[in-house]
């Protein structure tokens, strides 16, 4: 009996190692914690445009907006005018910090229960990932699709007077939507606080409207009794 239990333990351990090793690698450059002291541009997006299933996020240029790459398509959002935003698609852009991963296949899970804030997303992602053998010591991308009762997201704005779109005292603009259809693109890591997640959490999440007319950094969410779908990277 002891030998059987030992065999099962070793088998499970080896499976965990194999699973972790096969997850699509997450890359990051620059660091969120440096924003405010420097806005050095560390990556041109066109240098990674050859990845057909790229997912990624970071600020646009010197805090001129937000970048979200979804399945190899780069979305760029800016909000230079009070109450207004623009969303375009372009690879010829730069970012001071950026996180990305190339993911061609996903495992799909249903999320049960309400989501009332970004922390709830973090907890749901961690719980489902752990239950399905993911190693939470390794960073990974995720996405969530569905209809959401309410979503609030912001688009950062320039902090330096010499940068296009600068407005004194305004560091970002928030936009709120009800009954919003779309998807959240996110990255989970327990070891990159201040790099590509905030210091008080393990996730960095952007929201992209289904019709691609809005994109921004997720601040608030509310779902009540709706079925939403979580996608985690499939072993490759």
Language model features with spans:
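Bacterial Sec-dependent N-terminal signal peptides
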Residues: 1-24
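Start-of-domain marker
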Residues: 24-49, 205
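N-terminal low-complexity or amphipathic/hydrophobic leaders
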Residues: 38-96
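Extracellular structured ligand-interaction cores
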Residues: 64, 139, 202-204, 215
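Conserved mixed alpha/beta catalytic, RNA-binding, or beta-rich assembly cores of soluble enzyme
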Residues: 80-83, 87-132, 148
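Mid-length scaffold segments of soluble, non-membrane domains
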Residues: 114-173
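Short, hydrophobic/π-rich interface segment
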Residues: 159-211
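C-terminal structured interaction module
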Residues: 206-236
């Amino acid at each position: 009996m002891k030998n059987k239990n030992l065999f099962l333990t070793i088998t499970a351990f080896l499976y965990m190692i194999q699973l972790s090793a096969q997850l699509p690698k997450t890359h990051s450059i620059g660091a969120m914690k440096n924003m405010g002291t420097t806005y050095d541009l560390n990556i041109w997006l066109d240098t990674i445009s050859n990845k057909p299933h790229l997912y990624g996020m970071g600020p646009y240029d010197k805090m001129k907006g937000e970048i979200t790459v979804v399945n190899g398509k780069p979305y760029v959002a800016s909000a230079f005018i009070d109450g207004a935003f623009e969303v375009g698609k372009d690879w010829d852009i730069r970012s001071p910090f950026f996180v990305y991963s190339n993911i061609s296949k996903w495992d799909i899970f249903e999320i049960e229960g309400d989501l009332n804030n970004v922390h709830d997303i973090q907890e749901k992602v961690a719980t489902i990932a752990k239950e399905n053998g993911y190693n939470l010591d390794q960073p990974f991308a995720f996405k969530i699709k569905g209809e959401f009762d309410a979503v609030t997201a912001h688009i950062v704005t320039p902090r330096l007077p010499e940068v296009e779109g600068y407005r004194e005292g305004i560091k970002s603009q928030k936009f709120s939507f009800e009954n919003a259809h779309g998807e959240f693109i996110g990255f989970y890591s327990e070891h990159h606080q201040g790099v590509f997640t905030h210091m008080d959490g393990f996730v960095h999440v952007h929201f992209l409207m289904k019709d691609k007319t809005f994109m921004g950094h997720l601040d608030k969410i509310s779902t009540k009794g709706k079925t939403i779908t979580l996608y985690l990277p499939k072993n490759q």
